[in-house]
Amino acid sequence: MRDSSTPVRETVEHHLVSDGFRAAIPALRQSYQQNDFAEIPAFMPDEIFRSTLQELQDLFDGQSRRRDTNIEQSGCTPRRFTTLARDNIANGSSTIPAVFESSALRAALEEIVDEKVLPVPYEPEQYIATRLHEPGDVHGWHWDDYTWALVWIFKMPDENNGGSLEYVKDVPWDPTNPRVKEYVTAGPVTRRHPSAGSAYLLKAGTTLHRVSPLTYAAQRMMVCFSFASVTDLKSKHDHESIQALF
């Protein structure tokens, strides 16, 4: 693993306990309680964002894998994008592991969701990265294995070019009978288009969601951190979807 230097960790922790960050928590809590979604503007300081973006670009240039497949457990919905696995990120980024391991981050998330927030026990799903960049690239409808996804956005296309988060909240996932078309048709489908530099928290285990297709070449680059609830740790997860993609 690449060394997550003490200055980086200290900067991350200091930002997450700063008055400015904490001042946003009541509004984030309200958004999450109403929508199972909360967008955190300026998730990290500019210097951290810029250095992490450079790390990601280098990793995508040298260690990424292109995927073009359908995932059976989510109704054979498509995945067309480029991926970075957790271990590639851990070995090539100083910041992303520090963010995932931050006790201040988990404490802030617990205030937002009003539950205990835990690191996921399955290491390959702790954090991953994807890049949509070709026309037709899409991260099709799916649920996550664990309760929460925290998605840090590094590049985002114009809203009229796709790349938006679309979701239907409060729907169960049965991998043997996912009923994706039924849930999407019944809706309501909520659309969000977060900006680069922001992060969003989604109750992804009970929210059917996708990243809408790109209509022309552009970039949507993100890192997804997964966090577990106490209930998650008592449940079995087969991890077939994550294994197929990363």
Task: For the regions a language model picked out, list residue spans one by one.
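N-terminal auxiliary "cap/dimerization" subdomain that precedes the catalytic jelly-roll/cupin core
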Residues: 1-78, 98-103, 243-246
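Glycine-/proline-rich flexible loop or hinge segments
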Residues: 32-39, 85-95, 224
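Hydrophobic residues positioned within well-ordered beta-strands of beta-sheet architectures
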Residues: 40, 148-150, 223
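Hydrophobic alpha-helical segments and helix pairs
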Residues: 73-112
